[in-house]
Structure formats: structure tokens, C-alpha cells
Amino acid sequence: VTGIWGIVNVTTDSFSDGGRYLDPDRAIAHGLELRDAGATVLDVGGESTRPGAERVDPAVEEQRVIPVITELAARGIAVSVDTLNASTAAAAVGAGARIVNDVSGGLADPDMLAAVAASGADYAIGHWRGPSDDMYARADYLRPSREVAGELRERIGEAAAAGIAPSRIILDPGIGFAKAGAQNWDVLRGLGDITALGYRVLIGTSRKRFLVETLRAAGADPSTSPGSGADDVSVERRDLATAVTSALAVRHDVWAVRVHDVAATRDALAIAHAWEG
């Protein structure tokens, strides 16, 4: 059965819910709500990785996420830390996180692979080509899914060389990272190129820009004026689109999906699994 990672953003500037859960108690309560809705993992992050986001000092990041991870892990919940920083990863695992989710796949911090290897945690390797401020300048592909798979294979080799066992590795094709518009759909259609590498595969499409672009082309929300930007597509529509992509991913044997709206995705996955039999 496809797992569901519930997103807990303890940030000021995440594109979807920045600032809403900056208070640790609110973040913990939100995490518990996601757990009750069906999340199998809670992915806690203290630094936004949206395009153009400013970097956060690791000490500040740790102040944000460690109290939340400590409390959620103490309740027996599987927790992942969403971080680019080796020091935060190590502190989070010490606080009870079982997975390090690094969207850069070890490229952002040269100490990350050694930290993960020493921690014993599982490691989600994201496909990444550079910092968020210029990621779209790097969105140059001939065959997106094959190139993403090839670059992930390189990251796997680096992780193995650092002492991270294959059984601990999770692959994330990095939807929305250094990929523009239709390239994201190309990667999703070609997920077989990534699952063929033989590792667990995690995808994160939740509320992302390429979904907004597709929904905008389908028609504007009745309550908004045309051309008003990303906000002319409601969160509800984005969550429905996310749930649909999650259901379709079942056919590609994806191990887990990372989402904001766990309940909608839970229902979509239930239908998809019933269809598949």
C-alpha cells in the first residue's frame, strides 16, 4: 500500500502555508491531525525550498524543528526531517527522526552523506541541480525522466561510497525542482525509469506550480478575477489535483507520496488500490 507523508512546515515562507505552524505547539497539533488522517510519516521542515526562498541558518532551523520532532517521535510516529543541512539532520535523528529527506541529494552540504551514514537513518535523495534561486535556469532536458534517473544513479553511487546501505535509500525525482511546466509531466509519465533503479520511490507534487498552471488552463475559479496569479487557483483545487496525481502514481509502483492534504490523498489512494485489485 502506498505510504502518505504528511507535510509539517515549521517555516515563515513556505509557498503554501508559511508561518501557519511556526509555533511548535501548533506544528505538533497539525502533525497529530495529519497522523489521524492517515499519514504514515510526518515530514518536518524548518526551511522553505520553494523557488527563490532565502536560506535559513542551521541553528535557526534546528530551533524550529527539534522540539516538534522530539514530541512527535516520542508518540511513536515515524518522522522525517526535511533539510539540506548535515548538522540539522544529525540533530533531528538524535531527537527521534527516522528519515532524512534531502531535496539536494547531498549536493547542498558536503557533510550530509557522512552525517546520514553515521546516523543510521534512512535517506531520501532528491533530484536537484542547484539552489532554489536559479533552479529554473537549470531546467534543460532532452529526455527528462531518463536524465533524472541517470543523475539519481550518480547520487546513489555517492551515498553508497559514503557508507549508506541501499536498503536505507529512497529516491525522489524532485518534481518542481529544476523542472519547468511540462517537464514535470514528462518525469511523472516516465516514473518507470526511476522505479527501475530498484529503490523505494517518493514523489511530491503537492500544490506545486505545474499543477496550478494546468488547473488555470482548465478554467479559473468563479470567485477570482482572471490573471490574478497563483491565487486564482484555490487550495482545494490544488489538493484535488495532488490527490489525482497520487492515485495515478500507484500504477508506477511509487512507494510513498508527500502531501499537505492527507485525508484527500488517503481517499484517492484507497480508490486507486481498489481499482488495481
What feature does the model see in each segment?
Residues P166-R168:
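Short acidic capping loops at alpha-helix termini that bridge into adjacent secondary structure
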Residues V1-I4:
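Extreme N-terminal starter segment of soluble prokaryotic enzymes
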Residues S16-H30, T49-E71, I77-A78, L84-A86, ...:
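Active-site-adjacent loop and "lid" segments of alpha/beta metabolic enzymes
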Residues A29-G45, H252:
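Catalytic domains of carbohydrate-active enzymes, especially glycoside hydrolases
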Residues T11, G46-S48:
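Short, basic/glycine-rich phosphate-binding loops at helix/coil junctions
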